[in-house]
Curated annotation (Swiss-Prot):
<dbReference type="InterPro" id="IPR034679">
    <property type="entry name" value="ATP_synth_b"/>
</dbReference>
<keyword id="KW-0066">ATP synthesis</keyword>
<comment type="function">
    <text>Component of the F(0) channel, it forms part of the peripheral stalk, linking F(1) to F(0). The b'-subunit is a diverged and duplicated form of b found in plants and photosynthetic bacteria.</text>
</comment>
<dbReference type="GO" id="GO:0046961">
    <property type="term" value="F:proton-transporting ATPase activity, rotational mechanism"/>
</dbReference>
<keyword id="KW-0138">CF(0)</keyword>
<dbReference type="GO" id="GO:0045259">
    <property type="term" value="C:proton-transporting ATP synthase complex"/>
</dbReference>
<dbReference type="InterPro" id="IPR050059">
    <property type="entry name" value="ATP_synthase_B_chain"/>
</dbReference>
<comment type="function">
    <text>F(1)F(0) ATP synthase produces ATP from ADP in the presence of a proton or sodium gradient. F-type ATPases consist of two structural domains, F(1) containing the extramembraneous catalytic core and F(0) containing the membrane proton channel, linked together by a central stalk and a peripheral stalk. During catalysis, ATP synthesis in the catalytic domain of F(1) is coupled via a rotary mechanism of the central stalk subunits to proton translocation.</text>
</comment>
<dbReference type="InterPro" id="IPR028987">
    <property type="entry name" value="ATP_synth_B-like_membr_sf"/>
</dbReference>
<feature type="transmembrane region" description="Helical">
    <location>
        <begin position="23"/>
        <end position="40"/>
    </location>
</feature>
<keyword id="KW-0472">Membrane</keyword>
<keyword id="KW-1133">Transmembrane helix</keyword>
<dbReference type="GO" id="GO:0031676">
    <property type="term" value="C:plasma membrane-derived thylakoid membrane"/>
</dbReference>
<dbReference type="GO" id="GO:0046933">
    <property type="term" value="F:proton-transporting ATP synthase activity, rotational mechanism"/>
</dbReference>
<dbReference type="InterPro" id="IPR002146">
    <property type="entry name" value="ATP_synth_b/b'su_bac/chlpt"/>
</dbReference>
<keyword id="KW-0813">Transport</keyword>
<dbReference type="Pfam" id="PF00430">
    <property type="entry name" value="ATP-synt_B"/>
</dbReference>
């Protein structure tokens, strides 16, 4: 007891070692058990559920992100393929258009040349007919002149 008095503690103080100490220890253990079973475990369960929910959402988000990246890559490939196909189709259409234009131009030139040749042949025919007619008229006129000259003599 001298030791307790030396530190200024008196009997009936805060840390008296007597029969109430084991009772207090039992109360602390009982309170810890009650708090653990009524408060800490349910809160822990809620926290664990929330952690599982968050981790599942993160995993799901990562999976969806990887799926989106795959789809994006696939769509970019399809887009590039579509662009290439469109360029090929446009090129083919331009070639076909040029071919049709050249064919139409050649046909028009052939028709123009045929019309020109027909007109030339017609002109030659008419020229030949006119020459023949002039020749015949010249022959008739010369015969007429000869006949008049013969009659006058």
């Amino acid at each position: 007891m001298l030791a307790f008095n030396f530190f200024g503690a008196t009997e009936g103080g805060l840390f008296d070692i007597n029969a109430t100490l084991p009772l207090m220890a039992i109360q602390v253990v009982a309170l810890t058990y009650i708090l653990n079973s009524l408060f800490f475990k349910p809160v822990g369960n809620v926290v664990e559920k929330r952690e599982k929910f968050v981790s599942n959402n993160i995993i799901e988000a990562k999976n969806k992100l990887s799926e989106v990246k795959k789809l994006e890559a696939e769509l970019l490939t399809q887009l590039q393929s579509a662009r290439t196909e469109a360029q090929r189709i446009v090129g083919e259409a331009e070639n076909e258009s040029d071919k049709l234009y050249k064919e139409a131009l050649e046909l028009a030139n052939n028709e123009a040349n045929a019309s020109k040749e027909k007109a030339r042949l017609e002109i030659e025919s008419q020229t030949s007919a006119a020459r023949d007619q002039l020749s015949k008229q010249a022959d008739d006129l010369s015969e007429l002149i000869v006949n008049r000259l013969i009659l006058e003599k």
